């Protein structure tokens, strides 16, 4: 076996490997974040569930504190799929044409839904931090 063969293989496969791995994620790249991936990214960018200065009491549970903060910011509503959709008496479902507009209007006002549908940058997530 020729000792130069591994070197040639590396020269030929090196660029292919770099190309296959793709570009490294940058803060400007949009990433679709849904459900717990959105929450984890938000905690990673903002620093953690105990970042708030509003109450300096000991946390009984980090997850509970984070969920309460998300609920106050109206972010949790977009993470929970409401499977119990019932119409009250006399209410009719909206025509199918307006469903598209409602869907995009909800995504525009709900950051969690927007990040799931369109993707968020790190800068977008930073705007949701409480400080």
Curated annotation (Swiss-Prot):
Residues 58-104 form a propeptide. One of its GO terms (molecular function) is insulin receptor binding. It is found in: Secreted. One of its GO terms (biological process) is positive regulation of epithelial cell migration. The keyword Protease does not apply. Expressed in prenatal and postnatal Leydig cells. Found as well in the corpus luteum, trophoblast, fetal membranes and breast. Its main location: secreted. InterPro entries: INSL3/INSL4, Insulin-like, Insulin-like_sf, Insulin_CS. PROSITE patterns: INSULIN. GO terms for cellular component: extracellular region; extracellular space. Keywords: Cleavage on pair of basic residues, Disease variant, Disulfide bond, Hormone, Secreted, Signal. Residues 1-20 form the signal peptide. It holds the Pfam family Insulin. Disulfide bonds join 34-116, 46-129, 115-120. SUPFAM superfamilies: Insulin-like (SSF56994). PANTHER family: INSULIN-LIKE 3. Heterodimer of a B chain and an A chain linked by two disulfide bonds. Seems to play a role in testicular function. May be a trophic hormone with a role in testicular descent in fetal life. Is a ligand for LGR8 receptor. Belongs to the insulin family. It is linked to Cryptorchidism: One of the most frequent congenital abnormalities in humans, involving 2-5% of male births. Cryptorchidism is associated with increased risk of infertility and testicular cancer. This is Insulin-like 3. It comes from Homo sapiens. The lineage of its organism: Eukaryota, Metazoa, Chordata, Craniata, Vertebrata.
């Amino acid at each position: 076996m020729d000792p130069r063969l591994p070197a040639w293989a590396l020269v030929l496969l090196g660029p292919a490997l770099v190309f296959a791995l793709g570009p490294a994620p940058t803060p400007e790249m949009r990433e679709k974040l849904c459900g717990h991936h959105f929450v984890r990214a938000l905690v990673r960018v903002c620093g953690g569930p105990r970042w708030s200065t509003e109450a300096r009491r000991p946390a009984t549970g980090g997850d509970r504190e984070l969920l309460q903060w998300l609920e106050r910011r109206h972010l949790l509503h977009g993470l929970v799929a409401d499977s119990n959709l019932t119409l009250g008496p006399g209410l009719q479902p909206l025509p199918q044409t307006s469903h598209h507009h409602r869907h995009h209007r909800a995504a525009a006002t709900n950051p969690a839904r927007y990040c799931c549908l369109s993707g968020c940058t790190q800068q977008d997530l930073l705007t949701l931090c409480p400080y």
